[in-house]
Amino acid sequence: MNNSKIPKLSFHSDPNNVTRDFPKTKRQKVQKREMDMILTPNNNKLNILHSSGSGIRRCYTDDTSATYTKKLTFGGDPKIIERVKNNERKVRKDIDSLLNAISEIEKESVRIHARELPAITLELDAKVKACRELQNEIDGLSTEMDLKDNQCDLQRKNVELSSKNIVSMHAVKVQEFENDLEEELSNAKREWTYKLMEVENLKPDERLTDEMRQLKTEFEEVNRKLFILQNENENECKNYKKELDKKFEIFKKVKNDARIELDGEQERLSKVLKDLQDTHGELKENIKTCRDEFNDFEKRIGEAEVNFHSMELAVVPLKKKLASTSQALTQVQEEKKQVEGEANNWKKKYVNELEKVQQELYTRQNLATSIEEIKGYTRCFAYANERQMPDEFHINYVDRCICENSGEKRVQVFDRVVLEEIHKDHKRLYNECIPFLEKYISKLINCSIIVVSQQPTAPMKKTLLKQLIEQYGENYKMTLNILHLDGSIKHSDVGLDNPTEIRDLSQDEECMNILTLDTKLGKDEESHSMNIYIGSMSTVQLNRELDDAPSVLSHILTKTKQCFVFKINAGENIEKALALAGKLKRTITLPQLD
C-alpha cells in the first residue's frame, strides 16, 4: 500500500548513497549471496534481553563461524565484508522501523476499539433515552392538564346544580305552606259564610252575636299570628339566603384560587413544554451530527481494519522471532531469580556480620574510653572533612592521626578521627562522643565537650543537646542553663519542651550551654545531679583562656572530664589546630574524680 508506515528495504549502496555500477546479472548474484549470508540462521542470533515500556531492546551477536564462512565465501576481501556489514545494519534498522510502525498501528487500533467507539455509542444511547423520557413526560403532563380541566368543569356544574336545588327546595316549602294556609282560610271562610247566611236568615240571637264576636276576635288573632309567622318566615328565608350567599362566595373564592393556581401551573408547564421542545430540536440536531460523526468513524475504522489486516500479515514472521526470543528471555529471568536468591542469602549474612562488627566496635570504643581514662590525658577528637582538606595534609586512619607533608613532617595523634557527613546532621559525631558521655553520666561525674573551630558551630551544639535530651529525658530531670565566658551574665532554667528555644540558645557562640541531669524524678526520691558543659571556641580564644588564669574555662577544665572536638577542613587554620591539640595533650591532665 502507498500509505503504509512500513519502510522499504534497501541494499548495495555506498556510504554516499550511490549505487555501484556493474552488470544486472552479476548484481543479482551478489545480492543473492549477500542476502543468503545475512538471513542464514547460523550467522546471526537475535537475543531480546529486556522488555520495557519504551520498546524492545535488541542486540545482535555474530558467531565466529559466520566470520569464517564470510572469509570462505568472499575469499577474505575486506571491502565485501564491509559491504555485507553495512547491509546487515540496514536490515536491522528496517526491522526496528517495522516493529515501531507495528506497535503504533496496534496502539491506534486498540485505542479506537476500546475508547472512541464505546463512548460514541453510549452517548447516542443516552441522548435517545433522554428524548424518549422527555416525550413520555410531555404526554403525561398533557393528560394531567386535561384531567384538571374536566375536574374544574365538573365542580362548576355541581355548584350551580346544588345552588339551584337549594333555592327550588325552599321555594317548594314556602309554596306548600302558603297553599295550606289558603286552604285553611278558604275552608274557614266558607264555613263562616254558611253561618253568616244562616244568621242573616235567622233573627239575631244574642248568644250567636256573642259567638260571632268571639269568632271574629279569634279570626283577628289568627290573622295576627299568620302575619307574625309570615314575617318570621321571611326573616328566616333572608338569613338563610344570606348564609347561602356567604358560603357560595367562599366556595367561589376557593375554586377561583384553585383555578388561578391551575392557570399558573398550566403556564409553567407550557414553558417547560416549550423548553423541552427546544431541547428536543437541539437533540435532533446533535443526533444528526453524531450520526455523521459515527459514519465518519465507521469509515476510519474500516480503513484502520484494512491497515491492521495488512500489518497482521507483516507481523506473522516477526511473531515467530518474538516467540523464540521470549523463550530466551524466560531462561534469563529464571537465572535472574537464582541470582537474586543467592544475593538475599549473602545479604542476610552481611546483616549478621554487620551487627557483630557494630557490637565489637561499641565494645572497642568503651575499652578505648577506659584506656584514655586510665592514662589521664585530655581527649581530643578530629572532626575532619577530607574532601575539603588542603593537599599538604592527609589522614592516617590506622594510627588515628593527621599528617602534614610540607616542610617538616608533622604528625598529630587524636583519640578519634570522625569524618564529617555529607548531609551535615552531625549524628556521627554524637555517636562517637556518646561512649565518653555514657561513662560519666552513669557515675554522675561532670563532663564537658568543647568544639574548636573558626566557623559557626551552632548546628553541632544543637545536635548534641537535642540527642542528649531525647536519650536521657525520660530517666533524668533535665534543665538547660546558659553561662557566658566572662562569668557576668547567667540565664537559668530554660524550658526543654520547645525546640525553638534550644536552637536560639545554641546560636550564641560566646557562652557555654550547661545541661543538668538530676535523678530526682519524684518527691520521695533522692537528688543526685551532674552537669554537661557544651561550648565552642576558636583556637585564639582557647589559647587566651588557657593562658589567662583563673577563668571560666580553667574552672570548667579543673572540675570536669573534658573532650575537645577540632574541626579540620579548608575553612580552618589546620596548623594552629594541630599545634593546640598537641599542647592540650601535653599540658592538661584529667582530674581524678572517680
Swiss-Prot record:
Residue numbers spanned by region Disordered: 1-29
One Pfam family in the UniProt entry: Microtub_bd
Keyword NADP assigned: no
One Gene Ontology CC term in the entry: kinesin complex
Induction: By alpha factor.
Keyword tags: Coiled coil, Cytoplasm, Cytoskeleton, Microtubule, Nucleus
Main location: nucleus
GO biological process, one term: nuclear migration involved in conjugation with cellular fusion
Location in or out of the cell: Nucleus; Cytoplasm, Cytoskeleton, Microtubule organizing center, Spindle pole body; Cytoplasm, Cytoskeleton, Spindle; Cytoplasm, Cytoskeleton
Gene disruption: observed consequences: Short mitotic metaphase spindles with splayed microtubules increasing spindle width. During karyogamy (nuclear fusion) of mating, abolishes the formation of a microtubule bridge between the two nuclei thereby leading to a failure in nuclear fusion.
Segments forming a coiled coil: 81-360
GO molecular function, one term: microtubule motor activity
Role of this protein: Together with the minus end-directed microtubule motor KAR3, involved in spindle midzone assembly, karyogamy (nuclear fusion) during mating, and with an essential function in meiosis I. To contribute to spindle midzone assembly during mitotic metaphase, the KAR3-CIK1 motor cross-links anti-parallel microtubules to align them on the spindle axis; as the motor travels polewards splayed microtubules are pulled into alignment.
Assembly behavior: Interacts with KAR3; the interaction is direct.
Further comment: Present with 98 molecules/cell in log phase SD medium.
Protein name: Spindle pole body-associated protein CIK1
Organism: Saccharomyces cerevisiae (strain ATCC 204508 / S288c) (Baker's yeast)
Gene behind this protein: CIK1
